[in-house]
């Protein structure tokens, strides 16, 4: 057994009073069944999003609103799709 001060450094592998940085933090206010289901884009929606992405990797607010209206999606779905697409390309390179 080691004295308490041995475990007080941020580089220690020993036990600590805080949470492990690798542990997943669960949101206590949401139950798993309340999680919003993953959006399943139609082929037409995907083709349109991909086309828009080839034209411009970043959308203006106005263009995002237009796309959302034209595709029957909400703006957040459009925004997240573009963010994920940029992240995927960055990760691959």
From Swiss-Prot:
Primary subcellular site in the record, as a coarse category: nucleus
UniProt entry keywords in alphabetical sequence: Developmental protein, DNA-binding, Homeobox, Nucleus
GO cellular component, one term: nucleus
Compositionally biased spans, kind Basic residues: 21-30
Range of residues in the leader sequence: none
A GO biological-process term: neuron differentiation
InterPro entries found in the cross-reference section: Engrailed_Homeobox_TFs (IPR050720), HD (IPR001356), HD_metazoa (IPR020479), Homeobox_CS (IPR017970), Homeodomain-like_sf (IPR009057), HTH_motif (IPR000047)
GO molecular function: DNA-binding transcription factor activity, RNA polymerase II-specific; RNA polymerase II cis-regulatory region sequence-specific DNA binding
Protein name per its UniProtKB record: Segmentation polarity homeobox protein engrailed
Organism: Schistocerca americana
């Amino acid at each position: 057994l080691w004295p308490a001060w041995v475990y007080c450094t941020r580089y220690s592998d020993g036990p600590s009073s805080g949470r492990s940085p690798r542990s997943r933090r669960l949101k206590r206010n949401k139950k798993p069944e309340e999680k919003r289901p993953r959006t399943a884009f139609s082929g037409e929606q995907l083709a349109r999003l991909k086309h828009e992405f080839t034209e411009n990797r970043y959308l203006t607010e106005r263009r995002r609103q237009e796309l959302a209206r034209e595709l029957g999606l909400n703006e957040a779905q459009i925004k997240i799709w573009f963010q994920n697409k940029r992240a995927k390309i960055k990760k691959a390179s």
